[in-house]
Amino acid sequence: MAIKKFKAYTNGRRNMSSLDYQANLSGHRPEKSLLVALPTHSGRNNQGKITTRHHGGRLKRFYRLVDFKRNKDDILATVKTIEYDPNRSANISLVVYADGEKRYIISPKGLKVGQKIISGEQVDIQIGNSLPLKNIPEGTYVHNIEMQPKQGGVIARSAGSSAQILGKDETGRYIILRLKSGEVRKILALCRATVGEVGNEEHSLVNIGKAGRNRLRGIRPTVRGSAMNPNDHPHGGGEGHQPIGRKSPMTPWGKKALGVKTRKTKKASNQFIIRRRKESK
């Protein structure tokens, strides 16, 4: 999808960019039968207390029911539209099956309106088709990958993401995948995946440009701890601009921040990770 840049006729428009939706998406309204109401919580729990900071004030939207399981086997489906989804970075495609049922799926890179796709145990290796990992050849890029059979895809669903199949392990029960993060892990061979990479890969290149666009997305301002009072944050207080006065940065609740590993050391799925993801610098 092409990126559209704006002229700097105001400071907010300077360096702002956006995806060119009109040139790349079908100009259709969403399928009503696949929409559900999406209430806003503004980061509050059922007691009204803030549990997630910096959330609230987004535009009203509907949730699109996306088919992550792809369990309608051996029935041809035709891609009717490619649409924008406000709830995820990837685009979605409306597919109509031969029996008339309509479903939304994650739109892979290269999928066109009018194209035929299918799910099943033994289907062709082409973009948009869904089948078990054991039947996909080595070197193929896949997305919407299950971690447990019949669970529905949970890995590689965001814009531009994918995983590459490296082969089978010595037992044949597991398929070895390399994720975009660099992590190499084993997944049960019975789990399903969809062939191809997720589309809309330019999503990460968009420059928001001004705070108002983030407010429409439901992202509220983030105040620095050093700008607060000492009773509000461990970094707060002091006369003028002062250092934080601690050996390492802290969270608002006094825990160490930055560089602290947050993954549980005894997590059950650790046994399936062959190589950890690359450490960010």
From Swiss-Prot:
SMART domains: Ribosomal_L2, Ribosomal_L2_C. InterPro entries: NA-bd_OB-fold, Rib_uL2_dom2, Ribosomal_uL2, Ribosomal_uL2_bac/org-type, Ribosomal_uL2_C, Ribosomal_uL2_CS, Ribosomal_uL2_dom3, Ribosomal_uL2_RNA-bd_dom. The keyword Ribonucleoprotein applies. Keywords: Ribonucleoprotein, Ribosomal protein, RNA-binding, rRNA-binding. It comes from the Bacteria. Coiled coil: none annotated. GO terms for cellular component: large ribosomal subunit. NCBIfam families: rplB_bact. This is Large ribosomal subunit protein uL2. It comes from Metamycoplasma arthritidis (strain 158L3-1) (Mycoplasma arthritidis).
